[in-house]
UniProtKB/Swiss-Prot annotation:
The keyword Nucleotide-binding applies. ATP binds at G85, E86, Y87, G88, V89, G90, K91, T92. Keywords: ATP-binding, Nucleotide-binding, Plant defense. GO terms for biological process: defense response. SUPFAM superfamilies: P-loop containing nucleoside triphosphate hydrolases. Possible disease resistance protein. Residues 315-346 are annotated as: Disordered. The keyword ATP-binding applies. One of its GO terms (molecular function) is ATP binding. It comes from the Eukaryota. It comes from Arabidopsis thaliana (Mouse-ear cress). Residues 38-116 form the NB-ARC domain. This is Probable disease resistance protein At5g45440.
Amino acid sequence: MTQEDSSRGLTSVGRVDFTNRFADRYNEWLGTTGDETKQVEDRVETDSGLPGHDIYGFENEIKSLQHFLLDQKSYKLFKSLVVVGEYGVGKTALCQQIFNDYDVRNAYAPRIWVSMHSNESKEGLDGKICVLKTILKGLGVEESMFESIHREVVEEVSNRQEAGEIDGETAKEKEISALLYALHLNLRWKKYLIVFDDVQEIDNWDEKLDAKLNEGEKWGKYLSDGFPKGSGGRVIYTTRDENLAKNLVVQKHEIHRLWPLSDSNSVWKIYEAMIQKREKESPRNDKKCIDELMNKSRGLPLAARLLAELDPMLFDDGKANQNGSKDGKTDSVDNPNSEESKTKPL
């Protein structure tokens, strides 16, 4: 997962495609309720860089995550937390903000950002193996080590089969166990912070990392074995899936729900900042315009920003009439599938 700023997590081409996909789904999105989690088949690769936009309305959420990471009363304990919320609510941006917080950077080493979606081909690879390799790469482990582990595992399984020995472990399970051991050694005695962004069911990453090994169980069977305890390690997940979130942590209070913004002024600031970034004239910010934006975006920061990127909203009735639109809205908003919407540059 690259640490470089590629338009803050998206390449320029990716942003164009992403904005077009947003336009294609906009009418459908407006019809969903606030309680629904929008599951989109398209995912994007993210990185640890600061979001390329200001964050508004999440002051309390930022303080809550700072407390989770910097609480001196639980300095040595391993703790995990899930940020769960619907598509576009700002989970990734919130975690990027806290990941780069000055005090957090000074308190944790190493800090590793894992985008659960990768643009690299994973065809035929196990989800757990891919994630473990990503973490280990962030710790400086080279590809040659992974090749060596895989080669030794395949050879061991082959030799056992030829000798008629069966130990109940598949080659994949042995490889995962070896990677967990390597991870444990690299994280041992370190106060680490790992963020798993956009965890979904298909990733096959659905175990509690603070689970303890039961008596008689073999080490390396569970993901938790790879994450040392006792040095103050922290893990943060983001996910859209409420049920998956419950599988990732032990206690309910370890689930942090991120809701759409209820403060219409914060939503307007998000929209206005994007308009100004694109050097466009801001619409008047009277109550009618703010309420209309709140209704269209449903309080979702991503929706507010992309509405501005799609060059959609002319709230001024006079300007709207000059452009031949109705009720102060342009055709590109009423029909975001229009060619005008799809060809807007970013």
